[in-house]
From Swiss-Prot:
The chain crosses the membrane at residues 22-42, 58-78, 86-106, 116-136, 148-168, 170-190, 224-244, 247-267, 278-298, 316-336, 353-375, 406-426, 431-451. GO terms for cellular component: plasma membrane. Catalyzes the proton-dependent transport of sialic acid. It comes from the Bacteria. This is Sialic acid transporter NanT. PANTHER family: CARBOXYLIC ACID TRANSPORTER PROTEIN HOMOLOG, SIALIC ACID TRANSPORTER NANT. It is a multi-pass membrane protein. PROSITE patterns: MFS.
Protein backbone atom coordinates (compact mmCIF):
# COMPACT_ATOMS: atom_id res chain seq x y z
CA UNK A 1 0.00 0.00 0.00
CA UNK A 2 1.08 3.60 -0.56
CA UNK A 3 1.17 6.17 2.25
CA UNK A 4 -2.12 7.58 1.00
CA UNK A 5 -3.93 4.25 1.06
CA UNK A 6 -2.50 3.39 4.47
CA UNK A 7 -4.37 6.40 5.91
CA UNK A 8 -7.67 4.89 4.76
CA UNK A 9 -9.26 2.43 7.25
CA UNK A 10 -8.76 -1.14 6.06
CA UNK A 11 -12.47 -1.88 5.73
CA UNK A 12 -12.90 0.96 3.22
CA UNK A 13 -10.68 -0.91 0.77
CA UNK A 14 -13.47 -3.48 0.39
CA UNK A 15 -16.48 -3.00 -1.84
CA UNK A 16 -19.98 -4.37 -1.31
CA UNK A 17 -19.39 -7.42 -3.50
CA UNK A 18 -16.32 -8.40 -1.48
CA UNK A 19 -18.23 -8.07 1.80
CA UNK A 20 -21.10 -10.10 0.35
CA UNK A 21 -18.65 -12.78 -0.73
CA UNK A 22 -17.18 -12.89 2.75
CA UNK A 23 -20.62 -13.03 4.40
CA UNK A 24 -21.64 -16.01 2.31
CA UNK A 25 -18.45 -17.91 3.06
CA UNK A 26 -18.51 -16.99 6.77
CA UNK A 27 -22.06 -18.25 7.12
CA UNK A 28 -20.95 -21.49 5.51
CA UNK A 29 -18.19 -21.81 8.08
CA UNK A 30 -20.62 -21.10 10.90
CA UNK A 31 -22.83 -23.91 9.60
CA UNK A 32 -19.73 -26.07 9.34
CA UNK A 33 -18.89 -25.55 13.01
CA UNK A 34 -22.54 -25.94 14.01
CA UNK A 35 -22.95 -29.25 12.19
CA UNK A 36 -19.58 -30.60 13.33
CA UNK A 37 -20.35 -30.40 17.06
CA UNK A 38 -23.99 -31.52 16.84
CA UNK A 39 -23.09 -35.20 16.90
CA UNK A 40 -20.92 -34.75 20.00
CA UNK A 41 -23.68 -32.88 21.83
CA UNK A 42 -26.34 -35.55 21.26
CA UNK A 43 -24.13 -38.64 21.21
CA UNK A 44 -25.51 -40.05 24.47
CA UNK A 45 -29.11 -39.58 23.31
CA UNK A 46 -28.35 -41.34 20.01
CA UNK A 47 -26.55 -44.14 21.84
CA UNK A 48 -29.55 -44.72 24.10
CA UNK A 49 -32.14 -44.64 21.29
CA UNK A 50 -30.30 -47.01 18.94
CA UNK A 51 -28.72 -49.19 21.64
CA UNK A 52 -25.19 -48.55 20.39
CA UNK A 53 -21.99 -49.69 22.01
CA UNK A 54 -19.46 -47.09 23.07
CA UNK A 55 -17.28 -47.98 20.07
CA UNK A 56 -20.19 -47.58 17.65
CA UNK A 57 -21.11 -44.23 19.16
CA UNK A 58 -17.54 -42.97 18.92
CA UNK A 59 -17.33 -44.11 15.30
CA UNK A 60 -20.05 -41.61 14.39
CA UNK A 61 -17.64 -38.81 15.28
CA UNK A 62 -14.74 -40.48 13.49
CA UNK A 63 -16.79 -41.06 10.32
CA UNK A 64 -16.30 -37.46 9.21
CA UNK A 65 -12.52 -37.88 9.44
CA UNK A 66 -12.63 -40.95 7.20
CA UNK A 67 -14.07 -38.99 4.27
CA UNK A 68 -12.61 -35.50 4.81
CA UNK A 69 -9.41 -36.03 2.85
CA UNK A 70 -11.38 -37.24 -0.19
CA UNK A 71 -13.83 -34.34 0.04
CA UNK A 72 -10.99 -31.85 0.16
CA UNK A 73 -9.46 -33.39 -2.95
CA UNK A 74 -12.65 -33.74 -5.03
CA UNK A 75 -14.40 -30.47 -4.17
CA UNK A 76 -11.11 -28.61 -4.24
CA UNK A 77 -10.49 -29.89 -7.77
CA UNK A 78 -13.99 -28.77 -8.69
CA UNK A 79 -13.12 -25.30 -7.44
CA UNK A 80 -9.91 -25.26 -9.46
CA UNK A 81 -11.62 -26.25 -12.71
CA UNK A 82 -15.12 -24.77 -12.51
CA UNK A 83 -14.67 -21.93 -10.05
CA UNK A 84 -14.60 -21.46 -6.29
CA UNK A 85 -18.26 -20.46 -6.15
CA UNK A 86 -19.62 -23.75 -7.52
CA UNK A 87 -17.44 -25.73 -5.12
CA UNK A 88 -18.71 -23.63 -2.22
CA UNK A 89 -22.34 -24.24 -3.14
CA UNK A 90 -21.73 -27.97 -3.62
CA UNK A 91 -19.98 -28.29 -0.27
CA UNK A 92 -22.69 -26.55 1.72
CA UNK A 93 -25.38 -28.63 0.00
CA UNK A 94 -23.52 -31.83 0.82
CA UNK A 95 -23.05 -31.25 4.52
CA UNK A 96 -26.57 -29.81 4.86
CA UNK A 97 -28.08 -32.88 3.19
CA UNK A 98 -25.94 -35.01 5.50
CA UNK A 99 -27.26 -33.09 8.49
CA UNK A 100 -30.86 -33.63 7.39
CA UNK A 101 -30.13 -37.33 6.90
CA UNK A 102 -28.83 -37.51 10.47
CA UNK A 103 -32.14 -36.18 11.74
CA UNK A 104 -34.09 -38.72 9.66
CA UNK A 105 -31.77 -41.68 10.26
CA UNK A 106 -33.63 -44.87 11.29
CA UNK A 107 -30.50 -46.56 12.61
CA UNK A 108 -26.74 -46.70 12.99
CA UNK A 109 -25.82 -47.53 9.37
CA UNK A 110 -27.77 -44.62 7.89
CA UNK A 111 -26.35 -42.27 10.49
CA UNK A 112 -22.80 -43.43 9.75
CA UNK A 113 -23.26 -42.86 5.99
CA UNK A 114 -24.73 -39.42 6.67
CA UNK A 115 -21.65 -38.54 8.71
CA UNK A 116 -19.44 -39.61 5.79
CA UNK A 117 -21.35 -37.18 3.56
CA UNK A 118 -20.95 -34.41 6.15
CA UNK A 119 -17.21 -35.04 6.22
CA UNK A 120 -16.94 -34.64 2.44
CA UNK A 121 -18.93 -31.41 2.51
CA UNK A 122 -17.01 -29.96 5.46
CA UNK A 123 -13.68 -30.62 3.77
CA UNK A 124 -14.84 -28.96 0.57
CA UNK A 125 -16.14 -26.01 2.55
CA UNK A 126 -12.74 -25.42 4.09
CA UNK A 127 -10.78 -25.53 0.84
CA UNK A 128 -13.25 -23.78 -1.46
CA UNK A 129 -14.49 -21.05 0.88
CA UNK A 130 -11.07 -20.16 2.25
CA UNK A 131 -9.60 -19.98 -1.23
CA UNK A 132 -12.55 -17.96 -2.49
CA UNK A 133 -12.42 -15.28 0.20
CA UNK A 134 -8.63 -15.00 0.19
CA UNK A 135 -8.58 -14.58 -3.59
CA UNK A 136 -11.47 -12.09 -3.52
CA UNK A 137 -9.96 -9.66 -1.01
CA UNK A 138 -7.04 -7.28 -1.68
CA UNK A 139 -3.65 -8.87 -1.15
CA UNK A 140 -2.80 -6.58 1.78
CA UNK A 141 -5.92 -7.77 3.67
CA UNK A 142 -5.79 -11.50 3.03
CA UNK A 143 -4.70 -12.49 6.53
CA UNK A 144 -7.78 -10.67 7.85
CA UNK A 145 -9.89 -12.47 5.26
CA UNK A 146 -8.55 -15.83 6.43
CA UNK A 147 -8.79 -15.11 10.16
CA UNK A 148 -12.25 -13.55 10.06
CA UNK A 149 -13.53 -16.45 7.97
CA UNK A 150 -12.27 -19.23 10.23
CA UNK A 151 -13.82 -17.50 13.27
CA UNK A 152 -17.16 -18.63 11.88
CA UNK A 153 -16.40 -22.23 12.84
CA UNK A 154 -15.90 -21.35 16.53
CA UNK A 155 -19.01 -19.18 16.52
CA UNK A 156 -20.98 -22.06 15.03
CA UNK A 157 -19.79 -24.38 17.80
CA UNK A 158 -20.85 -21.88 20.48
CA UNK A 159 -24.25 -21.41 18.81
CA UNK A 160 -24.73 -25.18 18.64
CA UNK A 161 -24.13 -25.57 22.37
CA UNK A 162 -26.63 -22.79 23.10
CA UNK A 163 -29.29 -24.18 20.75
CA UNK A 164 -28.77 -27.66 22.21
CA UNK A 165 -29.72 -26.46 25.69
CA UNK A 166 -32.96 -24.97 24.35
CA UNK A 167 -34.08 -27.55 21.78
CA UNK A 168 -33.11 -31.06 22.85
CA UNK A 169 -34.83 -31.10 26.28
CA UNK A 170 -38.12 -30.10 24.60
CA UNK A 171 -38.11 -31.64 21.09
CA UNK A 172 -35.39 -34.28 21.25
CA UNK A 173 -32.09 -34.76 19.44
CA UNK A 174 -33.50 -35.06 15.90
CA UNK A 175 -34.85 -31.51 16.01
CA UNK A 176 -31.32 -30.21 16.46
CA UNK A 177 -30.28 -31.65 13.10
CA UNK A 178 -33.37 -30.23 11.40
CA UNK A 179 -32.51 -26.76 12.69
CA UNK A 180 -29.02 -27.21 11.28
CA UNK A 181 -30.33 -27.03 7.71
CA UNK A 182 -32.47 -23.87 8.07
CA UNK A 183 -29.74 -21.31 7.23
CA UNK A 184 -28.97 -23.21 4.01
CA UNK A 185 -31.59 -21.18 2.13
CA UNK A 186 -29.93 -17.89 3.02
CA UNK A 187 -26.45 -19.23 2.31
CA UNK A 188 -27.45 -20.51 -1.12
CA UNK A 189 -29.13 -17.21 -1.97
CA UNK A 190 -25.97 -15.35 -1.06
CA UNK A 191 -23.74 -17.67 -3.02
CA UNK A 192 -25.93 -17.41 -6.08
CA UNK A 193 -25.44 -13.65 -6.10
CA UNK A 194 -21.71 -13.36 -5.47
CA UNK A 195 -18.99 -12.88 -8.09
CA UNK A 196 -16.25 -15.39 -8.82
CA UNK A 197 -12.87 -15.02 -7.08
CA UNK A 198 -10.57 -12.47 -8.72
CA UNK A 199 -7.49 -14.70 -8.89
CA UNK A 200 -9.42 -17.60 -10.44
CA UNK A 201 -11.01 -15.32 -13.05
CA UNK A 202 -7.58 -13.94 -13.93
CA UNK A 203 -6.21 -17.47 -14.29
CA UNK A 204 -9.13 -18.54 -16.50
CA UNK A 205 -8.66 -15.52 -18.77
CA UNK A 206 -5.21 -16.85 -19.68
CA UNK A 207 -7.00 -19.74 -21.45
CA UNK A 208 -4.22 -22.19 -20.61
CA UNK A 209 -5.14 -25.84 -19.90
CA UNK A 210 -5.81 -26.67 -16.24
CA UNK A 211 -4.98 -30.11 -14.84
CA UNK A 212 -6.59 -30.57 -11.45
CA UNK A 213 -5.73 -33.21 -8.86
CA UNK A 214 -8.68 -35.28 -10.07
CA UNK A 215 -7.39 -35.16 -13.65
CA UNK A 216 -3.93 -36.25 -12.57
CA UNK A 217 -4.95 -38.96 -10.11
CA UNK A 218 -8.13 -40.44 -11.59
CA UNK A 219 -7.88 -39.69 -15.32
CA UNK A 220 -4.17 -40.15 -15.88
CA UNK A 221 -2.11 -43.21 -16.70
CA UNK A 222 -2.12 -44.45 -13.08
CA UNK A 223 -5.88 -44.01 -12.59
CA UNK A 224 -6.64 -47.68 -11.86
CA UNK A 225 -3.90 -47.93 -9.26
CA UNK A 226 -5.01 -44.65 -7.67
CA UNK A 227 -8.64 -45.78 -7.47
CA UNK A 228 -7.48 -48.96 -5.70
CA UNK A 229 -5.29 -46.89 -3.36
CA UNK A 230 -8.24 -44.59 -2.61
CA UNK A 231 -10.39 -47.57 -1.62
CA UNK A 232 -7.53 -49.01 0.44
CA UNK A 233 -7.05 -45.73 2.31
CA UNK A 234 -10.78 -45.43 3.00
CA UNK A 235 -11.04 -48.99 4.33
CA UNK A 236 -7.89 -48.54 6.43
CA UNK A 237 -9.22 -45.35 8.00
CA UNK A 238 -12.56 -47.02 8.66
CA UNK A 239 -10.84 -49.91 10.46
CA UNK A 240 -8.65 -47.52 12.47
CA UNK A 241 -11.39 -45.14 13.59
CA UNK A 242 -14.34 -47.47 14.17
CA UNK A 243 -12.61 -49.60 16.79
CA UNK A 244 -12.86 -52.78 14.73
CA UNK A 245 -9.21 -53.60 15.49
CA UNK A 246 -7.85 -54.39 18.94
CA UNK A 247 -4.19 -54.51 17.93
CA UNK A 248 -2.24 -51.26 18.21
CA UNK A 249 0.40 -52.71 15.87
CA UNK A 250 -2.14 -53.30 13.10
CA UNK A 251 -3.63 -49.84 13.58
CA UNK A 252 -0.16 -48.29 13.35
CA UNK A 253 0.61 -50.32 10.22
CA UNK A 254 -2.62 -49.19 8.55
CA UNK A 255 -1.81 -45.62 9.53
CA UNK A 256 1.55 -45.90 7.77
CA UNK A 257 -0.19 -47.35 4.70
CA UNK A 258 -2.52 -44.33 4.60
CA UNK A 259 0.40 -41.95 5.02
CA UNK A 260 2.22 -43.59 2.11
CA UNK A 261 -0.90 -43.32 -0.08
CA UNK A 262 -1.42 -39.65 0.72
CA UNK A 263 2.25 -38.87 0.05
CA UNK A 264 1.97 -40.76 -3.25
CA UNK A 265 -1.03 -38.63 -4.25
CA UNK A 266 0.84 -35.44 -3.36
CA UNK A 267 3.91 -36.53 -5.34
CA UNK A 268 1.79 -37.32 -8.41
CA UNK A 269 -0.31 -34.15 -8.30
CA UNK A 270 2.42 -31.66 -7.36
CA UNK A 271 5.22 -32.99 -9.55
CA UNK A 272 8.62 -31.61 -8.55
CA UNK A 273 6.99 -29.42 -5.87
CA UNK A 274 5.91 -32.44 -3.83
CA UNK A 275 8.34 -31.68 -0.94
CA UNK A 276 6.42 -28.47 -0.26
CA UNK A 277 3.06 -30.25 -0.19
CA UNK A 278 4.23 -33.10 2.04
CA UNK A 279 5.83 -30.70 4.53
CA UNK A 280 2.61 -28.68 4.67
CA UNK A 281 0.70 -31.87 5.56
CA UNK A 282 3.16 -32.46 8.41
CA UNK A 283 2.65 -28.89 9.66
CA UNK A 284 -1.14 -29.29 9.70
CA UNK A 285 -0.81 -32.68 11.40
CA UNK A 286 1.21 -31.20 14.26
CA UNK A 287 -1.09 -28.17 14.42
CA UNK A 288 -3.96 -30.55 15.17
CA UNK A 289 -1.87 -32.63 17.55
CA UNK A 290 -1.02 -29.64 19.74
CA UNK A 291 -4.51 -28.10 19.77
CA UNK A 292 -7.01 -30.95 19.66
CA UNK A 293 -6.17 -32.74 22.91
CA UNK A 294 -7.44 -29.64 24.70
CA UNK A 295 -10.39 -29.22 22.33
CA UNK A 296 -11.52 -32.83 22.78
CA UNK A 297 -10.63 -33.58 26.41
CA UNK A 298 -11.05 -30.23 28.19
CA UNK A 299 -14.69 -31.04 29.16
CA UNK A 300 -13.54 -34.35 30.64
CA UNK A 301 -10.77 -32.59 32.59
CA UNK A 302 -13.23 -30.04 33.99
CA UNK A 303 -15.72 -32.73 35.02
CA UNK A 304 -13.34 -35.32 36.47
CA UNK A 305 -10.27 -33.59 37.88
CA UNK A 306 -11.87 -30.26 38.82
CA UNK A 307 -15.28 -31.79 39.71
CA UNK A 308 -17.22 -28.97 38.05
CA UNK A 309 -20.98 -29.13 37.65
CA UNK A 310 -22.35 -29.17 34.06
CA UNK A 311 -23.35 -25.50 34.24
CA UNK A 312 -19.84 -24.53 35.33
CA UNK A 313 -18.30 -26.67 32.60
CA UNK A 314 -20.47 -24.90 30.03
CA UNK A 315 -19.36 -21.51 31.36
CA UNK A 316 -15.67 -22.38 31.12
CA UNK A 317 -16.09 -23.88 27.64
CA UNK A 318 -17.75 -20.65 26.52
CA UNK A 319 -14.62 -18.73 27.52
CA UNK A 320 -12.51 -21.22 25.60
CA UNK A 321 -14.61 -21.19 22.43
CA UNK A 322 -15.11 -17.43 22.45
CA UNK A 323 -11.37 -16.94 22.92
CA UNK A 324 -10.67 -19.06 19.84
CA UNK A 325 -13.16 -17.05 17.77
CA UNK A 326 -11.69 -13.72 18.89
CA UNK A 327 -8.20 -15.10 18.28
CA UNK A 328 -8.99 -15.82 14.63
CA UNK A 329 -9.83 -12.16 14.09
CA UNK A 330 -6.83 -10.95 16.11
CA UNK A 331 -4.63 -13.31 14.10
CA UNK A 332 -5.88 -11.70 10.90
CA UNK A 333 -4.77 -8.26 12.07
CA UNK A 334 -1.43 -9.62 13.30
CA UNK A 335 -0.83 -11.42 10.02
CA UNK A 336 -1.38 -8.31 7.91
CA UNK A 337 0.77 -6.28 10.30
CA UNK A 338 3.70 -8.61 10.99
CA UNK A 339 3.48 -11.07 8.10
CA UNK A 340 1.75 -14.45 8.15
CA UNK A 341 4.56 -16.66 9.43
CA UNK A 342 5.92 -14.15 11.93
CA UNK A 343 2.46 -13.58 13.41
CA UNK A 344 1.91 -17.33 13.70
CA UNK A 345 5.19 -17.87 15.55
CA UNK A 346 4.81 -14.92 17.94
CA UNK A 347 1.24 -15.85 18.83
CA UNK A 348 2.11 -19.49 19.56
CA UNK A 349 5.07 -18.48 21.72
CA UNK A 350 2.84 -16.11 23.70
CA UNK A 351 0.31 -18.90 24.22
CA UNK A 352 3.04 -21.06 25.77
CA UNK A 353 3.31 -18.62 28.67
CA UNK A 354 -0.32 -19.36 29.58
CA UNK A 355 -0.64 -23.10 28.99
CA UNK A 356 1.04 -24.15 32.26
CA UNK A 357 -0.98 -21.75 34.48
CA UNK A 358 -4.21 -23.02 32.87
CA UNK A 359 -3.62 -26.53 34.24
CA UNK A 360 -1.72 -25.53 37.38
CA UNK A 361 -4.30 -23.16 38.85
CA UNK A 362 -6.80 -25.87 39.74
CA UNK A 363 -10.52 -25.29 40.06
CA UNK A 364 -10.74 -22.92 43.01
CA UNK A 365 -11.48 -19.81 40.93
CA UNK A 366 -13.65 -20.44 37.89
CA UNK A 367 -13.38 -16.90 36.54
CA UNK A 368 -9.59 -16.85 36.64
CA UNK A 369 -9.48 -20.22 34.88
CA UNK A 370 -11.95 -18.96 32.30
CA UNK A 371 -9.90 -15.84 31.59
CA UNK A 372 -6.69 -17.84 31.30
CA UNK A 373 -8.36 -20.22 28.86
CA UNK A 374 -9.79 -17.31 26.89
CA UNK A 375 -6.38 -15.75 26.27
CA UNK A 376 -4.59 -19.09 25.82
CA UNK A 377 -7.07 -20.20 23.19
CA UNK A 378 -7.07 -16.75 21.60
CA UNK A 379 -3.31 -16.96 21.07
CA UNK A 380 -2.83 -20.71 20.62
CA UNK A 381 -5.96 -21.87 18.79
CA UNK A 382 -7.17 -18.62 17.25
CA UNK A 383 -4.01 -18.02 15.26
CA UNK A 384 -4.91 -21.08 13.17
CA UNK A 385 -7.39 -18.75 11.50
CA UNK A 386 -4.60 -17.63 9.17
CA UNK A 387 -3.55 -21.21 8.39
CA UNK A 388 -5.51 -21.22 5.07
CA UNK A 389 -3.62 -18.09 4.04
CA UNK A 390 -0.33 -19.72 5.00
CA UNK A 391 -1.02 -22.97 3.12
CA UNK A 392 -2.62 -21.34 0.09
CA UNK A 393 0.43 -19.19 -0.50
CA UNK A 394 2.49 -22.24 -1.43
CA UNK A 395 0.11 -23.34 -4.22
CA UNK A 396 -0.50 -21.75 -7.61
CA UNK A 397 -4.01 -20.64 -8.52
CA UNK A 398 -4.87 -23.64 -10.71
CA UNK A 399 -4.25 -26.10 -7.85
CA UNK A 400 -4.83 -23.91 -4.80
CA UNK A 401 -8.31 -25.08 -3.76
CA UNK A 402 -7.50 -28.79 -4.11
CA UNK A 403 -4.01 -28.33 -2.66
CA UNK A 404 -5.36 -26.47 0.37
CA UNK A 405 -8.32 -28.82 0.83
CA UNK A 406 -6.32 -32.04 0.47
CA UNK A 407 -3.32 -30.86 2.52
CA UNK A 408 -5.42 -29.54 5.38
CA UNK A 409 -7.81 -32.46 5.61
CA UNK A 410 -5.07 -35.10 5.48
CA UNK A 411 -3.28 -33.25 8.28
CA UNK A 412 -6.59 -32.96 10.11
CA UNK A 413 -6.40 -36.69 10.81
CA UNK A 414 -4.23 -35.52 13.68
CA UNK A 415 -7.47 -34.28 15.21
CA UNK A 416 -8.63 -37.89 15.49
CA UNK A 417 -5.26 -39.07 16.81
CA UNK A 418 -4.77 -36.28 19.36
CA UNK A 419 -7.42 -37.33 21.94
CA UNK A 420 -6.03 -40.87 21.86
CA UNK A 421 -2.53 -39.60 22.64
CA UNK A 422 -3.91 -37.46 25.44
CA UNK A 423 -5.78 -40.41 26.93
CA UNK A 424 -2.71 -42.69 26.71
CA UNK A 425 -0.49 -40.17 28.48
CA UNK A 426 -3.24 -39.63 31.06
CA UNK A 427 -2.89 -43.29 32.08
CA UNK A 428 0.52 -42.39 33.55
CA UNK A 429 -0.10 -38.76 34.48
CA UNK A 430 -3.08 -36.71 35.58
CA UNK A 431 -5.22 -35.67 32.62
CA UNK A 432 -4.37 -32.00 33.14
CA UNK A 433 -0.64 -32.76 33.11
CA UNK A 434 -1.08 -34.88 29.97
CA UNK A 435 -2.91 -32.12 28.11
CA UNK A 436 -0.42 -29.50 29.24
CA UNK A 437 2.64 -31.53 28.23
CA UNK A 438 1.22 -32.45 24.82
CA UNK A 439 0.23 -28.91 23.96
CA UNK A 440 3.44 -27.38 25.32
CA UNK A 441 5.78 -29.77 23.52
CA UNK A 442 4.04 -30.04 20.16
CA UNK A 443 3.45 -26.30 19.88
CA UNK A 444 7.22 -25.82 19.70
CA UNK A 445 7.34 -28.28 16.79
CA UNK A 446 4.86 -26.10 14.86
CA UNK A 447 6.82 -22.96 15.81
CA UNK A 448 9.97 -24.44 14.28
CA UNK A 449 8.25 -25.78 11.15
CA UNK A 450 6.56 -22.46 10.37
CA UNK A 451 9.20 -20.11 11.74
CA UNK A 452 11.98 -21.69 9.67
CA UNK A 453 9.73 -21.87 6.58
CA UNK A 454 10.35 -25.60 6.34
CA UNK A 455 8.16 -26.16 3.24
CA UNK A 456 10.49 -23.96 1.20
CA UNK A 457 13.63 -25.29 2.87
CA UNK A 458 12.68 -28.94 2.27
CA UNK A 459 11.83 -28.02 -1.32
CA UNK A 460 15.29 -26.53 -1.72
CA UNK A 461 16.98 -29.57 -0.18
CA UNK A 462 15.14 -32.21 -2.23
CA UNK A 463 14.02 -30.59 -5.50
CA UNK A 464 15.74 -27.19 -5.82
CA UNK A 465 14.92 -26.89 -9.52
CA UNK A 466 11.24 -26.35 -8.59
CA UNK A 467 11.93 -23.86 -5.80
CA UNK A 468 9.55 -20.92 -5.96
CA UNK A 469 10.97 -17.87 -4.26
CA UNK A 470 7.73 -15.91 -3.92
CA UNK A 471 4.43 -16.40 -2.17
CA UNK A 472 1.80 -17.21 -4.81
CA UNK A 473 -0.90 -15.32 -2.93
CA UNK A 474 0.86 -12.07 -2.07
CA UNK A 475 3.90 -12.10 -4.33
CA UNK A 476 6.21 -11.63 -1.35
CA UNK A 477 9.60 -13.37 -0.97
CA UNK A 478 9.55 -16.59 1.03
CA UNK A 479 12.01 -16.09 3.86
CA UNK A 480 14.72 -18.73 3.87
CA UNK A 481 14.04 -19.87 0.33
CA UNK A 482 15.04 -17.01 -1.92
CA UNK A 483 17.38 -18.17 -4.65
CA UNK A 484 20.84 -16.65 -4.95
CA UNK A 485 21.95 -15.52 -8.40
CA UNK A 486 24.10 -18.01 -10.30
CA UNK A 487 24.05 -21.79 -10.26
CA UNK A 488 24.25 -22.14 -6.52
CA UNK A 489 21.05 -21.74 -4.54
CA UNK A 490 21.16 -20.58 -0.98
CA UNK A 491 19.07 -19.19 1.82
CA UNK A 492 18.72 -15.44 1.92
CA UNK A 493 16.90 -13.57 4.64
CA UNK A 494 13.99 -11.43 3.57
CA UNK A 495 11.39 -9.19 5.16
CA UNK A 496 8.38 -11.40 4.47
Amino acid sequence: MTKTTQLIPWYRHLNRAQWRAFSAAWLGYLLDGFDFVLIALVLTEIQDEFGLTTIQAASLISAAFISRWFGGLMLGAMGDRYGRRLAMISSIVLFSVGTLACGLAPGYTTLFIARLVIGIGMAGEYGASATYVIESWPKALRNKASGFLISGFSVGAVVAAFVYSLVVPVWGWRALFFIGILPIVFALWLRKNIPEAHDWEARRSEKTPVRTMVDILYRGEHRVINIVLTLLASVSLWLCFTGELNSAVIVAALGLVCAAIFISFMVQSSGPRWPTGVTLMVIVLFAFLYSWPIQALLPTYLKTELAYEPATVARVLFFSGFGAAVGCCVGGFLGDWLGTRRAYVYSLLASQVLIIPVFAIGGANVWVLGLLLFFQQMLGQGISGILPKLIGGYFDTDQRAAGLGFTYNVGALGGALAPVLGALIAERLHLGAALCSLSFGLTFVVVLLIGLDMPSRVQRWLRPEALRTHDATDGKPLSGAQAVSGRKRGLVKSKS
